[in-house]
Amino acid sequence: MILLRNLTLARAGRPLLEGVNLSLHANQKVGVTGANGCGKSSLFALFTGDLHQEAGDLELPPRWVIAHVGQETPALATGALDFTLDGDAELRRIESDLREAEDKHDGEAIAHLHMDYGHIDGYSARARAAALLHGLGFADADFERPVAEFSGGWRVRLNLAQALMCRSDLLLLDEPTNHLD
């Protein structure tokens, strides 16, 4: 559960939220609406730990994984499919650990990491990422294209694919339909 108690949030000295009390429970779907500049993105930044409240309390479950679709996607050299796969931090950690174990010829670690990889469904990760990209309108030929080559709208779709690839407890969508081509 997410709990805000008497929470106050300000930016540049301007109060965005004052004395807010709110409880959000698991499996709830909540929309946050408001005019430009009213603090929706700042609220999300509070949830991700990028901002801190001026007063009051924010309680998030300590082990929750948060996926966030921001409004901007940097121009990266990473290919679209790999960018999407980067959304699954545990997958990427296991892959990195596996490469390291293979370099060290550590058979026991390799065996354990392959078990972990199977447990998180790592063997189907590329297919799942491809399905996400197809669902968002990407063609197979786009998978290896660098993120930097896509227009802003297509980068927003890549951000969404990356967030959906994350096995998260909380998904924050910050204007996910803005700038779509």
Placement of each model-derived feature along the sequence:
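ABC ATP-binding cassette signature C-motif
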Residues: 1-181
